[in-house]
A protein has these predicted regions:
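Betabetaalpha-Me/HNH-type nuclease active-site subdomain
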Residues: 28-56, 380-520
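Secondary-structure capping and boundary motifs in well-ordered enzyme cores
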Residues: 58-66, 161-166, 174-181, 310-318, ...
Length: 548
C-alpha cells in the first residue's frame, strides 16, 4: 500500500498512542515468534482502512497505530543495516518506496507531531527529547528508542530477516473516496491494538455531523474543530500525570451543563447532536473541551506553587473536585480565591476519606457548584457549615464524626491518608513558628513519602535498651497504630533506620518540623512510651479538628 503512494494520518484521527511496555513490545515479540515458527506464508499485519485523497495519496482511517509502528520499526532496521554496510539495490529501492525518496516522505503522522517524526525517526537529525510537547510525540520517541535498543545488539543476518518479514508482510485493505464516509467508518471501526477513547470518537462524530449538516459552513467548522483538538492534544501531555482524557470529557460535561450529576458523556453528546441545534452545540462544546484541558494544565502548574490546590488534589475524588476548579478558572475567578476554594475542598475531601462514609457529596455540593459564577463564597461557606451541622443528613463529615475516626487505629490501607494528614500537620508547624521566609512545603517535594511507626510494629529484640514501652496487649491495641505514633519520612530515610532502638532513630529525626518535635518531646526522657504517644496524639487530633 505504501509503495508508490503517500500515506497520511488525518487530523481527526487520534495521535500515536501505543506504549513501549505494551503494544510496541508485543509488535516485536509477534514478529520474532513468526520468524521462529518457519511458517511459509507471509506475516499478516491485519486490515487497514484508507480514504483516497489524491492521485497517489491516502489517509489511513483504521490501523494507523500499527502502520505508524511499522514505519518506526523499519526505520530502526534500515539504520542498523546502514551501520553495518551500504544498502543493496533492493534495500535502497525498498527504503525509497516506503520511507523517503529524496525529499518526499512516504508516511506522515498528524501535523503537530509530523516534524518530530521526520527529525527523530526518519532523518535522525534530532538526537534529544527537548521540545517534545505532546504525549503522542513522547510515545513516538519511546517506540523508536525501544526498537533501536533491541536491534543494536542483533546480528546483521537477523536484522535482514526482520526487514524481509516486515517488507514482505501481507494485509487486507478497504478504500473509501470521501472524508465523510471515512469518518463514519472510523466511528464504527476499532483498531485491534488500542480502542479509541470516547474523546476520539466524539471528535469524529462532530466532524461527521458537520459534513452532513454544515452546508456552506462545512469547511470553516471542520477547520475550527481540528484546531481545537490540536490544542487539546498538546494539553494532554501537561495533564496526563493526574487525569485521563476521557475523564476530562466527563468533567467538561459537568461544567457545560452545570451539574455534578452528569455521568454518561457519549450518551449525552449523542443526544445533543441529534437536535436541530447540533452545529451550535459542536462549536460550543469543542470550545468548552479546549478550555477544560487548558484550565487543567493551569491547575497542574498552579498546584506546584499552592499547597491548598495541591491538597485538594491529593485526596483524589476528582469527579467532584475538578469540575469546581475547571469552572472557577473558566469564570475568571482570581487565583487567590481559587486557592481559598481549594483549601475548603481539600479539607472536605480529606474528611470524607477519613470518616469513610457512603453518603454522597454531590447531593450536598451540587447547588453551590451551580451557583458559583464570580465568587467562591457559597462553596466555602457550605463546607464550613458542614463541619459543625448536626442534622443527620448533613452530619456525616462534622467534627464529632471526624474525631471518632481519627482517634481510632490506622491500619495499612489508611496509610495514604495518614501521610496527607501529617504533611498538612507539617505545614501547620511551619506556620505556627511565625517566622518569615519559611514557605509551606509541597507534598511532592518529599522523596517518596513513607509513614514511619516511631515505636515499630515488631518489638525490637533489645527490650529495655530499645527505648520503647512494654509491648503488652494495651500498647499493641491502643497505641502502636495511632496517629500519635506515626511520622512522615522520605523513603530513603525510613529504609535507613528500620527497626532500630529509639535513640538511634531519634538522632536522625532532624529534617521536618514534626521530626524535630519528637526530639524536643524526648529531650530529657529518651523513651518513646504510651504517655508520649498520647501527648502527640492530642496535638495532631486538635490540629485536625481546628484546621481541616
Amino acid at each position: 500500500m505504501i509503495r508508490g503512494n503517500q500515506i497520511v494520518v488525518p487530523d481527526y484521527q487520534r495521535a500515536y498512542s501505543w506504549e513501549k511496555g505494551r503494544q510496541v513490545s508485543v509488535f516485536l515479540d509477534d514478529l520474532e515468534d513468526y520468524l521462529k515458527s518457519s511458517v511459509a506464508a507471509p506475516y499478516y499485519f491485519g486490515h487497514f482502512l484508507y480514504e483516497k485523497t489524491g492521485e497517489a495519496t491516502y489517509a489511513v482511517i483504521d490501523g494507523q497505530q500499527r502502520l505508524t509502528t511499522i514505519v518506526i520499526f523499519l526505520c530502526t532496521l534500515f539504520n542498523r543495516i546502514r551501520e553495518y554496510r551500504e544498502f543493496s539495490d533492493e534495500e535502497q529501492d525498498l527504503y525509497e518506496d516506503i520511507i523517503k525518496r529524496r525529499s518526499t516522505y512516504k508516511f506522515s503522522t498528524v501535523k503537530y507531531d509530523n516534524q518530530l517524526f521526520k527529525d527523530y525517526v526518519i532523518d535522525q537529525t534530532k538526537k534529544d527529547r527537548y521540545g517534545i510537547d505532546t504525549t503522542s510525540g513522547s510515545r513516538i520517541a519511546d517506540a523508536y528508542d525501544y526498537f533501536s535498543g533491541k536491534v543494536k545488539d542483533m546480528e546483521l543476518s537477523h536484522v535482514e530477516q526482520l526487514l524481509h518479514a516486515t517488507a514482505k508482510a501481507s494485509c487486507t485493505t478497504h478504500i473509501v473516496n470521501n472524508e465523510a464516509e471515512a469518518i463514519q467508518m472510523f466511528i464504527f471501526q476499532n483498531d485491534r491494538g488500542k480502542k479509541p477513547s470516547h474523546l476520539e470518537v466524539i471528535k469524529a462524530q462532530f466532524m461527521y455531523q458537520i459534513h452532513i449538516y454544515g452546508g456552506e459552513e462545512t469547511d470553516s467548522l471542520i477547520e475550527e474543530v481540528k484546531n481545537r483538538f490540536e490544542h487539546i492534544y498538546r494539553s494532554i501531555s501537561e495533564v496526563e500525570d493526574f487525569v485521563e482524557e476521557d475523564a476530562v470529557l466527563l468533567h467538561t460535561l459537568k461544567v457545560y451543563f452545570n451539574s455534578l450529576w452528569e455521568s454518561t458523556p457519549t450518551e449525552r453528546v449523542n443526544e445533543e447532536i441529534s437536535k436541530p441545534t447540533r452545529l451550535q452545540f459542536i462549536k460550543d462544546f469543542s470550545l468548552a473541551l479546549e478550555r477544560s484541558f487548558n484550565n487543567l494544565a493551569r491547575l497542574n502548574s498552579d498546584r506546584n506553587n499552592d499547597v491548598n490546590i495541591e491538597a485538594a488534589l491529593a485526596c483524589g475524588r476528582y469527579e467532584i473536585v475538578l469540575p469546581f476548579f475547571i469552572k472557577a478558572y473558566t469564570k475568571g475567578i482570581p487565583l487567590s480565591e481559587i486557592s481559598r476554594m481549594g483549601k475548603a475542598l481539600g479539607d472536605l475531601m480529606l474528611r470524607d476519606r477519613i470518616v469513610k462514609t457512603r453518603a454522597d457529596l454531590r447531593s450536598r455540593l451540587n447547588d453551590v457548584f451551580q451557583q458559583m459564577e464570580t465568587s467562591v463564597d457559597d462553596v466555602v461557606g457550605r463546607i464550613i457549615w458542614m463541619k459543625e451541622v448536626g442534622d443527620r443528613w448533613w452530619a456525616y463529615w462534622n467534627n464529632n464524626v471526624l474525631q471518632l475516626a481519627v482517634e481510632a487505629n490506622w491500619h495499612h490501607n489508611d496509610h495514604g491518608i495518614a501521610k496527607i494528614i501529617l504533611w498538612k500537620y507539617e505545614n501547620h508547624l511551619i506556620s505556627s513558628e511565625g517566622k518569615s521566609g519559611y514557605a509551606p512545603i509541597s507534598y511532592r517535594s518529599i522523596l517518596k513519602p513513607h509513614l514511619e511507626h516511631i515505636a515499630p510494629r515488631t518489638e525490637n529484640g533489645e527490650k529495655e535498651a530499645a527505648g520503647y514501652d512494654t509491648y503488652d496487649d494495651d500498647f499493641r491495641e491502643n497505641y502502636l497504630l495511632r496517629l500519635g505514633n506515626f511520622l512522615l519520612l522520605s523513603a530513603p530515610h525510613n529504609e535507613s533506620i528500620g527497626n532500630k532502638p529509639f535513640e538511634l532513630k531519634r538522632s536522625t529525626y532532624d529534617q521536618l518540623r514534626q521530626q524535630r518535635e519528637i526530639q524536643i518531646m524526648t529531650e530529657t526522657d529518651r523513651v518513646w512510651n504510651k504517655a508520649k504517644i498520647s501527648e502527640r496524639q492530642k496535638k495532631i487530633v486538635d490540629f485536625i479538628l481546628n484546621n481541616l
